[in-house]
Swiss-Prot record:
Job description of the protein: Negative regulator of FtsZ ring formation; modulates the frequency and position of FtsZ ring formation. Inhibits FtsZ ring formation at polar sites. Interacts either with FtsZ or with one of its binding partners to promote depolymerization.
Principal subcellular localisation of the protein: membrane
Subcellular location: Cell membrane
Top-level taxon in the UniProt lineage: Bacteria
Cytoplasmic face residues: 23-571
Keyword Disulfide bond (UniProt): no
Natural source organism: Listeria innocua serovar 6a (strain ATCC BAA-680 / CLIP 11262)
Residue stretches in coiled coil: 170-215, 248-299, 326-374, 400-437, 478-529
Extracellular topological domain: 1-3
Membrane topology recorded in Swiss-Prot or TrEMBL: Single-pass membrane protein
Chain segments annotated as transmembrane: 4-22
Pfam families: EzrA
Protein name (database record): Septation ring formation regulator EzrA
UniProtKB keywords: Cell cycle, Cell division, Cell membrane, Coiled coil, Membrane, Septation, Transmembrane, Transmembrane helix
Length: 571
């Protein structure tokens, strides 16, 4: 019981201590908020309002001043009294240990102080700007009027450089003078804010006018002097080239110069209207156009040099290619008496011949136009280049065709020699098989041998045809070579199998008397070997029978065969 009482007392003391600590924290925060309120109240809003009120305000300035004073009245009559009530409520909540409510109230006070401070900042900032603007206006007004007077003097002394833009510049200056007079009137009425807006506007306008006055003389010089002179030089160069025999009608220069003159008048009017950016852009475009015309004239001069340098060489190339083409036609006639020339191959020649005729016709037309001066040298240059490219293609195609014709005789002789070589190869193969002393030849091989002979006969028969069709010869030639390769491979395989069968049976004989199954299978293998000459099948039967008795025996026999070791020496 005693310990329970002690525990209870400790809890009570802890609660009271915690409450006291929290209460002190809230009082501390409330005091801080109170200090912030006092600092806000001490700000010199009333003093600043009084200073500004003495300025005898009017217009926009007066309206702004009244709005600031109304805002201050709201702070004095409503916001501060409301703030006092909420501060009192916060203290009461803290006294009664209603800490959550106290916290919420303190947060509300902070928000109210922020609102009040923001409004006071706006009032003081506006009042300060107004007081400064009076002094600033006086200083900037003096500088602006001096700058304006300087612009006036410059227009009077250098107005001749502005040309027809002078009335427009003077009209702008007169408008600025009216704005400066209005500034003085507003300043006299103490409407300093609106007066300041006018000063700033006049300064900006004067900067624009000053920049325009710098640009106008050079732009007028472009439209009145430089561009017309450039067009006159262009026309003079054009006419000089025409007198020298250049065909330049495609340029339509008279029409283009007339159009550019209209553009110059338009650009000048833009300058007069003070649309200087548009005028500058248009002037630059005209310079670029004139430059393009000069590029065209220069290209014509270069093209004339090219035509004079390449006309005769191109004529010589045409003559040489005509000679080559005529010789090729004679060669075709001669070859056709001995060889068959395919229609596709003849079509190649006919196509190149037609292209050559077209190139010759184009060259003759070009020569006539150059002589009469009815073609631009640039167009003549393009045509010469096209003719030269066509001749290069024709020459390549006709050279290839001529080479194909020359190769016909060479291919014929090679085919005849190869037919003879293949006959000798068959005889050699037959003799080799005879030396092997085979029991006989299987039907399959005899059939291949007969077919091989027929292939060579077909090739030799084809070579006797008149006219000789070398494409058909090549096809028969290829078939005969393939048949010879196949026959040779079969013969080598057959002789290989015969030797292996003999070695396997000889090795297997060591088991023959002891193994009836092996003996029977060897008899079967020998039957295929000696009777129907199926050497591959005989080898398969003998190997299978031997492997049943001795696994891996065939590898030993095969290795001994390759090493030319006697079967009797195999262990």
């Amino acid at each position: 019981m005693y310990y329970m009482l002690i525990g209870f007392i400790i809890v009570v003391i802890a609660v009271i201590s915690a409450g006291y600590i929290l209460k002190r924290k809230h009082y501390q925060r409330i005091n801080e908020l109170e200090e912030t309120k006092i600092k806000l109240r001490e700000r010199p809003v009333i003093d600043e309002l009084s200073k500004v009120k003495k300025l005898k305000l009017t217009g926009q300035t007066e309206a702004l001043f009244e709005s600031w004073r109304s805002s201050w009245d709201e702070i004095e009559t409503r916001l501060f009294p409301d703030l006092e009530e909420v501060l009192l409520e916060a203290e009461m909540n803290a006294d009664r240990y209603r800490f959550r409510s106290a916290t919420n109230t303190e947060n509300d006070i902070e928000q109210m102080l922020v609102v009040i401070e923001k409004q006071m900042d706006q009032i003081l900032g506006g009042l300060k700007e107004l007081l400064i603007s009076e002094e600033k206006n006086a200083k900037e007004s003096r500088m602006t009027k001096e700058k304006f007077a300087e612009l006036r003097r410059e227009v009077l002394t250098r107005g001749f450089k502005l040309g027809e833009t002078l009335p427009y510049v003077e009209a702008k200056l007169n408008s600025l003078a009216e704005n400066l007079n209005r500034y003085d009137s507003l300043t006299d009425q103490a409407d300093h804010l609106e007066a300041r807006e006018i000063v700033i506007s006049v300064q900006k306008e004067m900067a624009v006018i000053e920049a325009q006055m710098e640009r106008i003389p050079s732009l007028l010089h472009e439209t009145d002097t430089i561009l017309p002179e450039e067009m006159n030089k262009l026309r003079a160069g054009y006419e000089e080239m025409v007198r020298k025999g250049y065909y330049l009608a495609q340029m339509e220069l008279d029409k283009e110069i007339s159009r550019m003159k209209t553009q110059i008048e338009k650009m000048k009017q833009n300058v007069i209207n003070l649309d200087l950016d548009e005028a500058e852009e248009g002037i630059e475009e005209l310079h670029n156009e004139i430059e393009l015309f000069y590029d065209t004239l220069e290209h014509e001069a270069e093209a004339r040099h090219f035509v004079k340098e390449n006309h005769s060489p191109t004529s010589d190339k045409l003559k040489r290619q005509n000679t080559v083409s005529d010789a090729l036609a004679e060669q075709i006639t001669e070859v056709k008496q001995t060889y068959h020339v395919a229609e596709d191959d003849l079509a190649v020649y006919l196509k190149t011949s037609a292209k050559l005729s077209e190139a010759k016709e184009n060259f003759e037309q070009l020569t006539a136009l150059i002589a009469s001066g009815e073609i631009a040298y640039s167009a003549a240059q393009d045509t010469l280049k096209e003719i030269d490219a066509a001749l290069l293609s024709i020459s390549s195609e006709q050279d290839n065709f001529a080479e194909e014709l020359r190769s016909l005789r060479k291919d014929e002789l090679e085919a005849r020699d190869d037919a003879e070589r293949m006959r000798r190869a068959i005889i050699t193969l037959d003799r080799k098989m005879e030396r092997e002393r085979l029991p006989g030849l299987p039907e399959e091989y005899l059939s291949l041998r007969a077919h091989m002979g027929e292939s060579i006969d077909a090739l030799e028969k084809r070579l006797e045809e008149k006219p000789l069709n070398m494409k058909a010869v090549s096809q028969d030639w290829r078939i005969a070579e393939e048949d010879l390769t196949h026959l040779t491979e079969k013969a080598e395989e057959m002789m290989e199998n015969v030797r292996l069968v003999e070695h396997v049976i000889q090795y297997a004989n060591r088991y023959r008397l002891r193994n009836k199954e092996l003996a029977d299978e060897l008899v079967q293998a020998e039957n295929h070997f000696y009777n129907d000459y199926q050497y591959k099948k005989a080898l398969e039967i003998a190997v299978t029978a031997l492997e049943k008795v001795e696994t891996g025996a065939f590898k030993k026999v095969e290795k001994a065969y390759e090493s030319k070791v006697s079967v009797d020496d195999i262990e």
